[in-house]
């Protein structure tokens, strides 16, 4: 093992996920002498002043035309040994527009497909790997003649690409619930309805290199951080969970990844997190 002093940049440094990644790395003796640098849009100032990074740079959004020039200046200055790209929209950018630094992300077309729940679900709709679903505009839901083909209860959430952590999510038990939720969330123009899955909440973490599965881990999310502040109870990261070793969860995740790579014609690289919820029989169904 090369124990030289390394420098690692972690993107999305102010958000919960990137900070969790850093805390995990710092628990390993392999990284005890590593210098950790972050960058972020810095909207969440707590992440700036928490102090777990050696330093943090403020960068524009990935959609900003100046993004590439700003991060290339940082890369040229810091000369990192590796970059860990965390936010989904940033992973999508780095999969399409490469940088001359060591990093590993999933392939471009795969990333474009799975960043959208609608495209992901449509790609796997002929399997039982994903829930029954439908994507609707606000006008379609508010139409007095609308009939929910999925029945109730139903899970409604923001249908835009890149949404995660239960954004705009709610368990609707009747049509009045749907209308009220649409009315409350006026900034959301498109909603996804999917069958409500009452079972366990699972994550399967699969690390690939050149098509080969290197590591795999599974966990059950039992409680979320500050769960009561979100009506869905889903706030992003867990405060309580447990590790699992379940063949069905593993096989479900790998089956979906394989099918999607066949669709895109690509070789898998990087870390893929497959989120699942158990159905009425607690059979894991992919949600993200």
Regions of interest found by a model, annotated:
Residues 2-105:
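ATP-binding N-terminal substructure of ATP-dependent carboxylate-amine bond-forming enzymes
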Residues 14, 87, 116-117, 174:
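Helix N-cap/beta->alpha junction signal
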Residues 67-77, 143-149, 183-184:
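Short amphipathic alpha-helix with an adjacent loop that forms part of the alpha/beta core around
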Residues 96-169:
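A conserved helix-loop-beta module that forms one wall/lid of the active-site cleft
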Residues 130-133, 167-198, 257-264:
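Conserved ATP-binding module of the ATP-grasp superfamily
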Residues 132-133, 153-181, 201-205, 225-242:
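Glycine-rich phosphate-binding loop of ATP-grasp-fold ATP-dependent ligases
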Residues 195-201, 205-261:
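ATP-dependent carboxylate/phosphate-activation module, predominantly the ATP-grasp catalytic core
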Residues 260-288:
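Conserved metal-phosphate-binding beta-hairpin within the catalytic cores
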């Amino acid at each position: 093992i090369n124990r030289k002093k390394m420098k690692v940049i972690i993107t999305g440094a102010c958000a919960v996920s990137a900070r969790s990644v850093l805390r995990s790395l710092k628990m390993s003796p392999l990284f005890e002498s590593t210098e950790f640098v972050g960058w972020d849009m810095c909207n969440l100032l707590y992440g700036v002043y928490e102090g777990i990074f050696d330093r943090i740079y403020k960068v524009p959004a990935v959609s900003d035309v100046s993004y590439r020039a700003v991060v290339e200046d940082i890369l040229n200055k810091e000369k990192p040994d590796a970059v860990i790209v965390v936010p989904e929209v940033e992973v999508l950018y780095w999969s399409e527009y490469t940088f001359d630094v060591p990093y590993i992300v999933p392939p471009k077309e795969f990333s474009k497909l799975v960043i959208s729940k609608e495209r992901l679900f449509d790609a796997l709709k002929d399997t039982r790997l994903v829930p029954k679903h439908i994507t609707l505009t606000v006008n379609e839901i508010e139409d007095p003649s609308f009939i929910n083909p999925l029945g109730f209860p139903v899970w409604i959430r923001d249908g835009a690409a890149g949404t995660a952590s239960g954004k705009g999510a709610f368990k609707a038990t009747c049509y009045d619930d749907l209308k009220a939720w649409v009315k409350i969330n006026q900034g959301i123009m498109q909603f996804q309805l999917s069958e409500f899955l009452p079972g366990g909440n699972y994550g399967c973490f699969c690390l690939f290199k050149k098509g080969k599965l290197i590591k795999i881990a599974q966990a059950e999310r039992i409680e979320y951080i500050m769960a009561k502040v979100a009506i869905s109870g889903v706030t992003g990261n867990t405060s309580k969970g447990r590790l699992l070793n379940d063949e069905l969860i593993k096989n479900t995740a790998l089956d979906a990844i394989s099918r999607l790579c066949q669709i895109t014609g690509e070789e898998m690289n990087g870390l893929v997190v497959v989120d699942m919820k158990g159905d009425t029989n607690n059979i894991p169904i992919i949600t993200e």
